Amino acid sequence: MLHELLLALLGYTGDLIIDRRDNNLSANTPISDECTFKLAPDISFIDPSDRELIERIITLGFYYRELERFSAKSRNLNWIRSENANPLENKEKPSVYRRALANGIVEILAVYSSSILHIEQLLLSETMPILATVTQGLNKFFSLLPPLYELILKIERGDIRGGELLNLLHKKCHCGVPELQTCIQRLLWHGHQVMYNQLASWMVYGILEDRHGEFFISRQEGRDVENSSSHQEISEKLSRLSTADASLSDWHMGFHISLDMLPEYIPMRVAESILFAGKAVRVLRNPSPSFLSQDDVYPQEPKRFPKIHGFEGRFNFQREPIINTGMRVEDLLPQSEADKIENMLLDLKESSEFHKRSFECAVDSIQAIAASHLWQLVVVRADLNGHLKALKDYFLLAKGDFFQCFLEESRQLMRLPPRQSTAEADLMVPFQLASLKTIGEEDKYFSKVSLRMPSYGITVKPSLLNVPKATSAAADGISGASISNASSEMSVDGWDGIALEYSIEWPLHLFFTQEVLSRYLKVFQYLLRLKRTQMELEKLWASVMHQYHSIFAKNKKSDQDKSPITQQRDQRFRSMWRVREHMAFLIRNLQFYIQVDVIESQWNILQSHIQDSHDFTELVGFHQEYLSALISQTFLDIGSVSRILDGIMKLCLQFCWNIENQDNFSNTSELEHIAEEFNKKSNSLYTILRSSRLAGSQRTPFLRRFLLRLNLNSFFESTAKEVMNVVRPRPTFPGLNQR
């Protein structure tokens, strides 16, 4: 009877103690949600008090058996063979975290079984009360096994695994029973061993070792290359991607944080640092062969990929072969730095308890190491500052002589509407001519710049671009509605779609994303329209002055300079010239504000950040602030202001084209309409810029300078007040309506 009781405490029932369930339990039999061990009902010689005590004691045997079944099932590695044979037959997904938990449970059960053995030896050697001795020897396990049983029952029913399992164990650690707390902490320690191994794989080697999707760093759906069970599939997928393309995809959209698997005691900030560090190590471990071949300083010496002792042998690392070139992979992430990362993780792994502060400090240190070496790669080796300067030269029009020459060479072409099929090829001729005249051979970045002419949608009608010369009588007969229609059709210029592309090579794609380049392009198209408008106003000066001097010389020879017609023409000329001067004044000050107060000042701020910072993540943030400041301080993020500025530039172009296509400034009606619209828009612009909406923004310091230049003699302020009047006389050119 003694041995049957002891066997029941180890999970084996018999005649005295029976199991209400079938004894033929398979590995897949679910855990029972209630104790099924009980004393046989036909045993009548046991006192009710002893029966009650025995039934209480044998519950430990039931808990032991269920815990042992859970451990055996979780530690069973037969799924490896069955997965290779037929993956579809695996109904239950394996879990390395459950296996780690099972290892911890086995340790606790080993202590329990040794206690049973000690009780047996004690009872056989001495004459002692059986039930009292058993109860006294196993008393501490009544506070351990039932909570552990409830734990595995919850895990089985909820299919809890991975980070969710760590989170559950961490919550269970907060209890008032010291023995139970110690056991749960030991189980959590086993789970953390798996997590630290995965962290080592990710943060030392840059490889995601997570076959069962339990790590809080995971691949995006549809991009699971490393976790594929077939090595042939890995080779096929990697062969389709170049190193640069693969690292680009990995960096921007290859990996993400799985919130379901992120333990609550690991903050999101720390998880993001882990994600960044692993991605950075991937970049440093897998450089582009073309990038390696650019550096001839180092001797060409083939070297094996280093193994990190302490974690080697745990992971099946697969790497693409690196071409034997000048620069070595080890130069990007030195072995000493990899050892430093490994030692930090080993210190955490060997600690008996999880200390949140120590964990966060270690992650921050590893993130700083990765960011520093990534900074060294991108900023120093890849010459980031040179590329930033090139983007400033070409996308922000810092090379003004080049774009001035380009616009002059393409001026006649841009008077015609772009042709859908040949617009880009047509622009390449003036683009190449401008480069030959202004770009020196020492500019190694110009080869990365290419001109593009994407689809521009609405085509500008040639009749609107080349305004036919009309008689004054016909011009006076144009109605306001027809002028308005012409202006609305004119508002879309196909050449506004001119775009630049910049060729980005590994590893600069980590810094210059498509979003960043699109923001540069947005500013470029705006600045090019502005410079084109300024050039047309300047060309108008030269053209009209040449025309005026020719007429003046001709009239002087014929003594007509005092005639009423000549005086009337001079009045029209002066009135037109005042409008042109107002346009040029606004455009010139706007361009000076953008180039000097905005671009140059923000560029100097960015340069100081680049010199002071040695952290890649900080540098990305500084560059984003730089671009945001460019867009906000040029008002591209305010729809109302940007629309007014676009309208002003198009009115200026209309004004120039109308005058250049007229003799003696005869088309007075359309010029009056353009002048009136320009006054409205320029005064509206000044009113908006002075509004309280912009007063408290980061635009304020430089915006005040711009407003000071515009309103130097209070002209804009006085005219803006006139615009606010309900009834305002239509501005006319003096002398134009006397006819």
Swiss-Prot record:
UniProt entry keywords in alphabetical sequence: Cytoplasm, Cytoskeleton, Microtubule
InterPro entries reported in the protein's UniProt record: GCP, GCP_C, GCP_C_sf, GCP_N
GO CC, alphabetical: cytoplasm; microtubule; microtubule organizing center; spindle pole
Subcellular location: Cytoplasm, Cytoskeleton, Microtubule organizing center
GO biological process, alphabetically ordered: microtubule nucleation
Pfam family, one: GCP_N_terminal
GO molecular function (one): gamma-tubulin binding
This protein's record includes keyword Lipoprotein: no
PANTHER family in alphabetical order: GAMMA TUBULIN COMPLEX PROTEIN, GAMMA-TUBULIN COMPLEX COMPONENT 4
Function: Gamma-tubulin complex is necessary for microtubule nucleation at the microtubule organizing centers (MTOCs).
Family from the record: Belongs to the TUBGCP family.
Name recorded for this polypeptide: Gamma-tubulin complex component 4 homolog
Provenance organism: Medicago truncatula
Gene that specifies this protein: 85P
